[in-house]
Amino acid sequence: YNPFHNGHQYQIEQARKKTNADVMIAIMSSHFMQRGEPAFIDKWKRAEAAVKNGIDVVIELPYIYATQAAHQFAQGGVDLLKLADVDYISFGSECGNIENLSEIADTPVNLNHIKEIMDTGVSFPKAYSLLTSQMEPNDILAVCYLKAIKDTKIKPVLIQRNTGYFDETIQPLASAYAIRNACIQ
C-alpha cells in the first residue's frame, strides 16, 4: 500500500467477497520495501489508509523479510499469517490463472542453473530474476506465496490485476508505480 490506491481497494473488496472473511488482515512492509527502497508513504499513514478502506488488522512484516527477494518476502508474510491462523491469503496477479501459477510453484527450481549463473559473478537475487524474467512482478510474488503455503491449511485467493506493476498510466485503477511517479513529477 505504497501508496494505497483503487487497485488495493478492489483487492480488499474482492477478497472479502470471495472468502466471506470475518476479519481482513494486511501484512505490510515497514519504512523500507523490497530492494531496500524507503517507503513513499510512512507506515503509519499506510496502515491508517488500509484500516479506513476495509482492513481490520495490520501486521508489520519485519524488515528482514520486507527488504528481501520475493521468496523470502512471501515466506515472512505467510509465517505471520500462519501465526494468525488464517484460512486464506489473497494476492494480485497479472496473468490471473491460478492453475498456471500453481504448476510453476510446484516445479522445482533448477539450483544447478542458478549456481551456473552465479558462477559468472551474478548475485542470487539477480540469478533468480533471470530465471523468472518472463513473468510479471506480481506473478512472481504469487508463485512465491503458493510455494510458501504449500504445506499449510491456507488457501490462495487470486485477484487479477488490470494494470501491470510498472504501468505508468494514470487511470481509475492506476498502479502504485504510476501514482508515485506522478507525485514526484
Region roles according to the model:
Residues 18-22, 55, 86:
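Short, high-confidence coil segments that cap the C-terminus of an alpha-helix
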Residues 47-62:
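A glycine-rich helix N-cap at a beta->alpha junction
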Residues 61-185:
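Active-site cores that bind ATP or allylic diphosphates and position pyrophosphate for catalysis
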